[in-house]
Structures are given as structure tokens and as C-alpha cells.
Amino acid sequence: MIRVALRGLAGRKLRAFLTALAIVLGVAMVSGTFVLTDMIDRAFNDIFTQSYANTDAYISGKSPGFTFEGDQVTPPSVSASILPAVRRLPDVQAAAGTVADDAVTKIIDRKGKPITTGGAPTFGFGIDYSEPRFNPLKLTAGRWPTAPNEVAIDSGTAGDQNYEVGDTVKVATLKPVRPFKLVGIAQYGSVGSIGSATFATFTIPAAQALLDRKGQLDAISVSAKPGVSQEQLVTQIKQVVPLNKVDVRTRAQQVKEAKKSASFTKIIKYFLLTFATIALFVGAFVIFNTLSITVSQRIREFATLRTIGASRRQLLTSVSIEAFVIGLLGAIIGLFAGIGLAVGLNAFFKAVNSDLPTTGLIVAPRTVIISLLIGVVVTLVAGLAPAVKATKVPPIAAVREGATLPRGRLAPFLPFVAIALVALAVALLAYGMFANTLATAVRLLALALGCLVLFIGVALLSPRLVPTLSRIVRPIAKWVMLGVTLIVYPTRIGAWLFRRGLYARGITVLQRIGALVGGLVMLLVIGPGLLFAAAWAMRYLSSAIGWGFIVAVVVTEVVLVVWVVLSVIRRLRGRGFASDLPGVRFDPATDRLSGENTRRNPGRTAATAAALMIGLALVTFIAVLANGMKQSNRRAIERQVKSSYMLVSANGFDSISPSAGDAVAKAPAVAVASNVRSGVGKASGSVQQITGLDPKTISQVYNFEWKDGTNTSIDNLGPYEAIIDKAFADKKDLSVGSRFSLQTPKGETFPLEVKGVYKAPPFYPLLGEVSISLPFFDRLYERPQNLYTFLDVKGGASDSTQAGLERDLANFPDAKVETRGAWIDAQDKDFDNFLLLLYVLLALAVIVSLVGMINTLVLSVFERTRELGMLRAVGMTRNQVSRMVRQESVITALIGAALGLPLGVFLAALVTRALAQFNVEFVPPWKNLIAFAIVAMIAGVLAAVAPARRASRLNVLRALQYE
């Protein structure tokens, strides 16, 4: 039976390849994710290992012992006076201090703008270059800085900006931007790329001045004399340093601590694997459908095997072997495709300025094993039901014409099973969303299982819905086909004219030249122009989809040019023929047959549509939820901000120097300038965002919704007093007059008295849970920086006013002024960019479903070869056959859309209800939903191109004899 299975696959190479392709994309996503994250992990591991290679003990500020939003809170600096005391210890061979900051040092590009890093660190270093053993950087050109006006920068920035040793480079820090002489170019150890991150390194005194570390260091590295262990050295150091202000660690302890900062790679891994799982899940539907159709088409073959003695177990083994080989083939291709995908993803991150440190390609044994295992297991599980179905073929079917498989004993109960699964899915989703005491992992598991069961339940129920849905969407499909035909008609006429000019006989030279020239104009100019206009119009429904269509039109133009060249080559070789004149009019017979064909086998149509349904449901879910969040975000900001302008960082999310706010506050046009600083602290036992406000001005530019207090509460805010938001007050049972403690990152604890309680929007509050006065904030926090500055101007916002404010910020290129409306629009753009990334990743699932539709149509054409031959024999033209197959595909796609779009909206409504406490609104983006339906219809048309072409070119006599 192994030989039978392998010969069967060899005889159906195209079907086997298309089936394997359904698993390739999912496996590629899995292997690509592992390869990419392994490259990133190795790079970070190399960075940390090399940074502390010669360090036996490491001294840093006392860790506050808490995290905020998953990130370690930066410890305070240490006194530089510790360094001489450490150097005098008997077991110390060498010690050196370091100044380091990862956010405020911005290298300015040649256009005068700060280099954007997409959220990656912008390091500023002060290094003792006389102790090279502790220097993690490696020169690639020039020398190290020795004077206050000298700097060395990273090789990536130097290459991107064409900076060379001897150039003048401007750098912005906590001080106004100033020029430095570039004396060196360096890289981080042996790591060739640190991603989008940048660094500028100075002398220690210069760094202390630029980064506000007067008399302070961020760390001290110490090496021991030969024979002294790291533990002995740490013990000795602890005897001469203030342990209430510093931490002393061994090299191993410090490397472990540093690696916590790279834990975000796990988030990237799980994020990408989620979409890989979705693609694999959709692929499983495609494989199930393909193998089911294949089994149905091979009834006589299986019956013959049964007749000559094959047992049911042997048939089960044969089909399972086919599934195994297809899965293994798909997994192997997917593994190698994943390596290319990892390189592509890294290039994509770099293109959007968000690349991460990486090393060379790493294909770990774990990656190979998991990729192959997933591909084979998913295919075997998906092929189990068709394999079992094959065992039920009776031997007598070998001599019957048109024999079909008997219905299973459980078939009558499937609708009830489907309804039960849908009910179970709703229960799981409700449990995951509304249960209050669930751990995050359990909640996510319940939601994931709920979605999985819901999709399976709807897929099992959909065969009952197919006949009704087919009748409903058939008229839509008819008009869709007319619209598509009209849009592509100039292209088709151009192709017909061009082929006529090449191949037609009995025409004059002038007619031939006219046909060739006219065909080329229609084919390469007018046709693509009409397609481009249609794609451009799609931008008004969905910008992302519109641009995707525009790219598709460009690709189409390239394909058409290649087709023209190949057609000329074929003509020179004496091959080819003139095609039929393409038609446009409605064809009632074709229209009716296409609808009947989709209803002929509801199970097959439903399984094909289910794959597209899942992809569309997820895209719709994300679009509706994201649009609700975007609207909630916009309204939350509009409720809070009263000022005309916002002063923010150039990249929109970093902090900015307080000096920038002070500079713009002096502008003649500014009536009110209110700085807002931000930090982290442990308030009443829990970690919260702490903001510093200007008591005299904040109420003029920020709208407080007071629950207990008035604007006077903050106007008179003094030291050891705070205003808090209502959510924090309710959680900690606080009210006006209550007292609570605040612990800062320096480890100091202060008592605070509540002077007012206000209600902040739960979605995107601009102030922290606890707010104190600016003077008091500056006392508690090292190097305080502005989160943003609210600006109200005389006479309202205008272009001239903004130009004047920008001139006042000339020394602070890392800050920018935006109107209130422009700043809100920028927040919307961030949502749109993230949504675009999700669309790109979910496109894999849609592509897999497209492969499934192609597969089903190809197999359907094989199965109906005699039927198609009969239709041709009784007068149906090639164009009619082609149109019938295309319309079948569009009907199937519309059924998938009719199921997927409402399902996605339903899931989004559930999640929105669960997020009601955050004021997330339910606002379906109707234009986007229409665009998704159009995409589904176009997917149906594209999926039918090759099958329709094959069906229209069947030889009539051979088709009538086909078995």
C-alpha cells in the first residue's frame, strides 16, 4: 500500500503540491519566527556577554525592586566618590566608572532632524577609555574622544548618514543641541548590527555634564586580581560601599539581570506564532477539503483495491501515507521558506526603522524538529476524516458508474453537534472575558479555545446554510462578474487584438499593424490605467487595501509586459493561436449553472468557504475592535486637552528636556505653558505612573472632571500633597484627606495627602494615577524630564504662530510642536500603522484560503471533466465555461464573506463589551467592511483564473471519454 500511495501522489503532482502549499505558509511562519527570534536572542546574548567579559564585580544604583508595564525601573546613579574607595581595595586589579543613558541622547542627521529609531534605545555613553578591558565598544575607524567637544558614534549611524571621521556631528542631550567633532566610529563588540539603536560616546566628564550626572556614575566595573573569586571580590566591595544605595553583583548575576531587558523577544515570538497558528488552522481546513474531494473522486480506484483483496486498514494506511508525505513535503518547503521569511521580516523591520540587533542565520535543531512535526501532525489530523471515509468504499462500487460514498452514521447528528459547539464557544468566550479572578494565561487560553471551537462549530453548521446563502449571493456574484468584466475588458480586448495581430490569417499588413499597436495600447496603457483608477478609488474605503491593490496593478503591468514578450517569442517559433473575442453580456444559463454547482455539494462548498471565513472573521474582528479603540482614544484626548498646541518629542513617545518647555514658554505668542513630567513610583503598595504638574497653569489647559475637589485643589497643591484619579482612589479606598505612601526609584518613601479626586478617561489617560506639584516632583526624581507641554497661545492656533514656536525650538530638534488636532491625528496614525501590521500577518491566512479555493476548483474541474465536455458538445462556448467557473468561485467567496464578516463583528462586540470598563466603543468601520467584502470577491475571481482557463480549454472528445 505504500507503493500504491506514492504512485498515487506521483500521478497527481499538481494536486499534491497545491495541498502541500496550504501547510507551507503556516510552517514557514513558525520556522521564520524561531529563526528570527533566535538571531535576536543570540545578538543580545553576545552583547551582554561581551559587555561584562572582563568584569568580576559590578556596582550600580540600588534597584527599586519593582517593574512598570513589564519593564525594569531604571535604578538611580551612584556617587563617583565610591570609585577611589573601590580601587584601593587589596583584591582589586582595576576599576572604571561608566555613564550611560538609553533615551535622551539623539544624534542629528544631515537634514537637521533627530535620527528616529522606532522605539529602540538612543544610548549616550561616558567611558573610561584608559581601561579598555571594561569598554564594550570596538573602534572601526578613528580614535576615542579625549576632549569635551569630541564624540564617537556607532557604525550603523555613520554609514546611514555618510558621516566620516573629522566631520561635525550635532547631538542633542538633556542640554540644547550642540556640535561635536567626530573622532571615532565604533561598533558594539563583535555584534555587527545593533538594529535601529544608536549610540554616541563621550569622555566621562563630558557625559556627566551633558546627561546631568554631575559627580555621579551609572555603574562601576571591577576586575579581581588573579586567584580572587568573584564572590570574594563582591564580599570585599560590600564592606566599603553604602549598601542602602548600591547593589553589588558578580558577573554572572549582572548578565542575568541585564538579560531581563531582552525579555521582549518572547513577546515577539508569541505574537508571530499566534498568526502562524491561524495560518495552520486555515490550512487544516484546506487539507481536509482537498483530501475529501480526492477520496470522493477515487471511489472506483479504492473499490478496485477492495475487490482485489485490500482491507479497510490498508486503505486507511494508504490515504494516511499520502497525507504524511504531503505534510512532510509542505513542512520541508515551509522550513526553508521560513528561513527566507526571517530574512524578509528583518528587512521589513529595518525598512520601517524598527530593526533589532541580529547575528547570522541560526537554524536550531529545535526549529527543524518543531517545523517538521507541526507540518506532519496538522496534515495527518486534517486528513484523518477523509482517510476513514475511504475505508467505507464498498467493493461493488468498482463496477458502478457514478458511485458515491454512503453517508456516515453520525451525519444526521452533525447539525446538533455544530450547535452544541457554538454554544460551548460562546460560553468559553464569556468565561474568558467576564470572569474576574482568572490569571492572564487562563483568560487567554479560554479566549483562544472559544474562538477555535466557534470557528469549527460554524464550519460544521455552514453546509446547512450553503443552499440558502448561495441563492442570496448569486445575484450579487452576477453583478460582480459584470463589474470585473467591464474593468478588465480593455485589457482582455487588448490581448485579443494583440493575438489577432500575431496569429490571424487573411488580414492585410495594415490591419495586422493596427491590431498589434491597438492591442498594445489597450493592453499596457488603457487597461492598467482603468485598473489603477479602480485601485485608487479603493483607498477611500481602506487606505491599506487601496495601496495593496495599487501594488497589485503594478505587478500586473509587469506580468502583461512579460506576456507580450513571451507571445512574440511563441509566434516566432510558429506556435500559438488567435483567441475568441471576449464577451460582456449576461448569460442566464451560465449564471444558473454556477449557482447550482455550488449547491450540488454543500459540504465541499462550505469547507472551501470556511477557510476564507476564518481569515475574514479575524480581519473583521481586528478592524472593528481597533476602530472602536481609535475612536475611544480620540474622544479621551479631546475630553482632556484644552490647549491649542502640544509640545512633544519628535518621535511622539520619548520624553523631552525640560529646557525645551522653558524655551517655548518664553515665546511672545504663548499665553500659557504647562509642563508635565512623568516617573514611576510605588504608591500605596502598587506601582503607578507619577506625574508632576504645574499647579498654577495645569487647570487652564487640562480639563479635570472632579469627583471630590475643584480646580482650587490643584491651584494650591504643595509638597507632600497629591491629586489622584478615581480608579486609583476606589482601588485603594482613598478620599480627600486620606494619606498614603510613595516610594521613588531611589528607594526613598514619602507620605502624601490626597487633596482632590478626579475622573480620568480609562482609555488613554494623559496624567498618571498620582499627580504632585512640579517643584516637589523635581525633588523626588533624578533628572526629571517632560512627558509633554500643554501650550495655549494668544489668538488661537495659526501657521505663523506655529512657525514662530518652531523657531524657538531650534536648539531642541528632538522636540516638536503640534496643534491639538494634529497630535490627535498622530495618535490615530499609530493605531493605523499597527493595524496595517496585523493585516499583513493575517494576509497569510487569507492567502492559504485562496490556495484552498484554487485547489477545490481545480479538483472540481477534474471531477466534472465529462460534464464540461458535454456542455461544450451541446453548444457552450469557451467563454461561457470560463465565466461559469469564475462565478462559482465568486459565489463561494461571497458565502465565506457572508459568514466571516458577521462572525468577526460578533467577536468584536463581545470583546468590546468585556472592555466596557475602559470606555472602548463599538464602532464598526463600515467602509473597511465593504472593502473586505470586495477583497473576498476579487479573491474569488483570482482563485478561478487557472481553473477557469483549464476548463475552457478541455478537448471536447477527450472530455466525453474521461473516467
Indicate residue ranges for each PLM-predicted region.
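Membrane transport/envelope proteins' first extracytoplasmic loop
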Residues: I2-F281, I293, A351, D355-T359, ...
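Interfacial "coupling" helices/loops that link adjacent transmembrane helices in transporter permeases
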Residues: G8, R12, A276, G283-G327, ...
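Alpha-helical transmembrane segments, especially those used as permease/efflux helices
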Residues: G11-L18, Q236, P242, I267-Y270, ...
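Hydrophobic transmembrane alpha-helices
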Residues: V24-V27, F271-I287, F324, I332, ...
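Juxtamembrane segments of multi-pass membrane proteins
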Residues: G65-T67, V73, R464-P467, R471-M481, ...
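Small-residue-rich transmembrane alpha-helices
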Residues: F324-D355, T367-K392, L421-N436, V458, ...
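Short cytosolic juxtamembrane segments of multi-pass membrane proteins
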Residues: K392-R407, S952-E963
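C-terminal transmembrane helical bundles of large multi-pass transporters
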Residues: T598, T605, A609, N675, ...
